[in-house]
């Protein structure tokens, strides 16, 4: 069976959408990973089909090495397949799309590819630059120099590209930063301006970046597991498709891409102009970040540690348990969403929460609870504590589900102690399964030192630990007593009974 290519697809009589190979290169993309290809490039591909934008993407590998990737994907005409697999509106989704939006992949650490990148920089066709260079990518490296070919850091590469474009008298571009850090576009622009200062470049160039370019902060949300790891399943998929594709990527159906900017972007971005679901332009992505953190991430952190203690191992199984699913939904709809009403449309939040349940019930992803439990103390502080405090401030009452989640979090760290070693706290849950709780060292040391302490004292010491929470949680009226009582139920009757009580 042949690898995917334009010729291979023609041979098998492929009838789907394909952008011609010679379409103009309108996008320069820093990053070539599964996320960009399955999420961002799929948006461009569908935007091309819907609007006739007719733009190809040049992928740039942002770090040295891995030359085999560029050579491999170029050998198959930069075509690849995205499988969308999961649950949507309660229905199982398993569909494929050939992505034809990419023209080539270059690695600027090869001299010819560096020159090719700079040729794209001054192209009249270039309109948009996209990046996802991981959380570590938007960082300042003082060793970068203006004449490096290329500089090591991504912001230095990008400012070098933009300076070359400005010097050639070309118009500005839109920059869409997709890295998973807060205010990604603003931070990227700040670091680029630092290089302009370091390198003594012209004030006129800084003004061009500020006035002629649009550097956007964006917020992305989808799960991209990447590739199919089971060889038998991969072979079955290839048989179904009619070709081999070593660069196939898998993702879930849910997609959300919030782009911070003005109304003009709606006409300039083909996927927004097409009205594709899940992508939108907004003056401020901050409320949507809050929605994601408090609903999606907050739900995980609230029910997962307790569900592990109850004997569950993967997220999907939790969604098939009426008590756990009910606990999560009661928390989201009765406790979390009401606190978001000042910033967000409540009906949108409810739709987002409904999508969360579908995402957690994905039949194609075995999402291990224990992996989600990493650093749960800091996660609960960032994701769930603000909602608890907002709820108390707005209603004068304790949110029962969120308060119970604190009790089950304590239970997660205080199962039978096996040992405190290295970077973990080794514990044994009731069914005999041994596990390692991983968190900040001070958290693990605290719980190891409290092994055998009675629960009333334990809860008091946890809630008054300002290193954990940044404040004394016993100052929240009634919380200490509630958590002591909920933890007593967990110890005597199990987590599921505590979850059930919180819903009554």
Question: Over which residues does each language-model region extend?
Answer:
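Substrate/ligand-engaging "lid" and interaction regions
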Residues: 1-504
């Amino acid at each position: 069976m042949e690898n995917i290519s334009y010729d291979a697809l023609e041979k098998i009589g492929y009838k789907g959408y394909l952008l011609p190979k010679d379409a103009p290169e309108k996008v320069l993309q820093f990053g070539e990973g599964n996320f960009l290809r399955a999420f961002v490039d799929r948006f461009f591909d569908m935007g091309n089909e819907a609007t006739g934008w007719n733009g190809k993407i040049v992928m740039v590998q942002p770090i040295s090495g891995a030359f085999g990737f560029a050579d491999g994907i170029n050998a198959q005409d930069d075509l690849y397949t995205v499988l969308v697999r999961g649950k949507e509106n309660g229905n199982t989704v398993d569909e494929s799309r050939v992505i034809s939006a990419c023209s080539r992949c270059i690695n600027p650490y090869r001299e010819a590819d560096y020159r090719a990148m700079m040729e794209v920089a001054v192209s009249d066709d270039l309109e948009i630059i996209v990046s996802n260079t991981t959380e570590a990518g938007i960082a300042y490296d003082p060793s970068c120099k203006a004449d490096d070919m290329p500089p090591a850091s991504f912001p230095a590469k990008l400012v070098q590209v933009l300076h070359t474009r400005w010097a050639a008298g070309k118009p500005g571009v839109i920059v869409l930063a997709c890295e998973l850090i807060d205010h990604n576009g603003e931070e990227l622009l700040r670091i680029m301006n630092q290089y302009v200062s370091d390198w003594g470049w012209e004030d006129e160039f800084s003004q061009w970046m500020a006035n002629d370019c649009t550097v956007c902060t964006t917020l992305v949300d989808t799960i991209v597991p990447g590739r199919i790891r089971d060889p038998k399943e991969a072979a079955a998929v290839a048989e179904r498709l009619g070709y081999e594709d070593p660069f196939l990527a898998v993702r879930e159906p849910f997609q959300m891409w919030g782009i911070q900017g003005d109304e003009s972007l709606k006409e300039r971005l083909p996927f927004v102009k097409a009205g594709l679901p899940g992508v939108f332009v907004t003056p401020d992505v901050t409320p949507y970040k809050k929605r994601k953190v408090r609903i999606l991430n907050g739900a995980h952190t609230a029910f997962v540690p307790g569900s592990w203690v109850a004997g569950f191992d993967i997220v999907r199984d939790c969604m098939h348990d009426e008590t756990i699913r009910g606990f999560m939904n009661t928390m989201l709809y009765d406790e979390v969403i009401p606190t978001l009403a000042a910033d967000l449309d409540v009906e949108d939040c409810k739709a987002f929460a409904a999508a969360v349940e579908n995402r957690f019930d994905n039949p194609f992803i075995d999402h291990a609870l224990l992996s989600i439990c990493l650093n749960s103390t800091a996660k609960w502080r960032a994701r769930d504590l603000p909602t608890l405090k907002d709820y108390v401030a707005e209603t004068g009452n304790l949110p029962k589900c969120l308060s119970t989640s604190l009790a089950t979090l304590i239970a997660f760290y205080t199962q039978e102690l096996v040992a405190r070693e290295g970077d973990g706290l080794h514990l044994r849950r009731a069914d005999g399964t041994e596990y390692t709780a991983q968190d900040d060292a001070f958290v693990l040391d605290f719980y190891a030192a409290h092994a055998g302490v009675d629960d009333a004292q334990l809860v008091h010491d946890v809630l008054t630990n300002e290193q954990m929470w940044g404040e004394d949680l016993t100052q929240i009226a009634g919380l200490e007593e509630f958590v002591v009582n909920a933890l007593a139920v967990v110890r005597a009757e199990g987590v599921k009974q505590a979850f059930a009580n919180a819903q009554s």
